[in-house]
Regions:
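PLP-dependent aminotransferase-like
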Residues: 88-170
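Conserved PLP-binding active-site segment in aminotransferase class I/II-type PLP enzymes
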Residues: 1-80, 85-88, 149
């Protein structure tokens, strides 16, 4: 293996990732409509017609589920909440394993812990810093229940390789 850049080796990336605007006019308009309504959140913590949020949230979930052809979609406030929901939705049991990246926000590793499962770190690949499919496959055991995949810096993971591995091992 060559010397890491931090130890004097050649860096993989010499040009910084580009900065870009992530909020467009449509998003600004939608946010202003919610703010102008005078009610930022219609989520209620009791069973009620608005239990799952206001009109905008319910419209988003409906549109999302129709677009992807799925029965349900749940909007959450952050990727952290989404990861926690996704791990819980697997029906994971205590002591089962979840393969996670060592190079991501801590929620990827803590979400399995919430369900008394075990996070198992797989290595990242050197160009995009996402999970290395070969190491993911090496880490799979009879206790593996899920793989948490995250994109880093807007760079996607190797979708085809990871999905093939996930299907292979169910």
């Amino acid at each position: 293996m060559t010397k890491l850049a931090i130890h004097g080796g050649n860096p993989i990336r010499v040009k910084p990732f580009p900065a870009y605007i992530t909020v467009g006019k449509e998003e600004k308009k939608a946010v202003c409509e919610v703010i102008d309504s005078g009610c930022l959140s219609k989520y209620l913590g009791i069973w009620h017609e608005q239990f799952n949020g206001g009109e905008q949230v319910q419209a988003l979930e409906k549109e999302w589920s129709e677009y992807f052809g799925v029965k349900h979609a749940i909007a959450v406030n952050s990727c952290t909440s989404g990861i926690y929901c996704a791990v819980g939705a697997t029906g994971i049991e205590p002591n089962e394993e979840v393969i996670v990246s060592p190079y991501t926000m801590s929620a990827s590793a803590t979400a399995p812990l919430v369900y008394n499962a075990i996070p198992v770190f797989a290595d990242i690949e050197e160009n995009y810093y996402c999970l290395d499919p070969e190491d993911v496959e090496r880490k799979i055991t009879s206790k593996t229940r899920a793989i948490i995949i995250v994109d880093i810096f807007g760079q996607p993971y190797d979708v085809h390789a990871i999905n093939s591995i996930a299907k292979k091992y169910n």
